[in-house]
Amino acid sequence: MKDSVLKDKRILAVDDEPDVLEVLREEITMAVPTCVVDTATSYDKAMELLASCTYDLAIFDIMGVRGFDLLRIAVNRDYPIPVVMLTAHALSPEFLKESIEKGARAYLPKSSLGHVVPFLEDVLTYEYGDVWRRILKNVEGIFSSSRGPYWRKPDEDFWKEFDEKIGKE
């Protein structure tokens, strides 16, 4: 069995729900014991950790911890941190678009936490376009069910340009 790309990595996970952080930590460290997962339940604690540690990857909840503010800070550092935006209540085309525009590397519904390890491995392994094509394949079904088949229509130009950027057919 080959080593995980998460081996010896350090991840920052930020969510205002301690249960979610515990699931993330357990899922990741059970699969990859040498991966360190630091957690924060607030924006302030996350800022403290970002200032004192070096991270290979970050996972930020969109709601409750100022996830978009943390995203902006993480991607605008001298050494940008790849960021996965995590969401349950903010699972919408609007928040997906904002995540993309602000530089997120990926977008993960909380309902997919059971698959977080292979998801994070993909984020660190695959190119930007490959990761986003996989994510869109997943969320398009969710959005089509909840919003109808024309969920892209309000931001049609953005989605067309993004599809071209990631090489989506």
Show the residue positions of the predicted features.
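Acidic, metal-coordinating helix/loop segments flanking the phosphotransfer/catalytic sites
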Residues: 25, 39-57, 65
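Short amphipathic alpha-helix used as the core "switch/output" element in two-component signaling
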Residues: 48, 63, 68-81
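Active-site residues of response regulator receiver
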Residues: 15, 58-63
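Conserved acidic segment of CheY-like receiver
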Residues: 2-28, 39
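Hydrophobic/aromatic residues positioned on beta-strands within the core alpha/beta folds
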Residues: 86-88
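Two-component signal transduction core modules
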Residues: 58, 83, 107-108
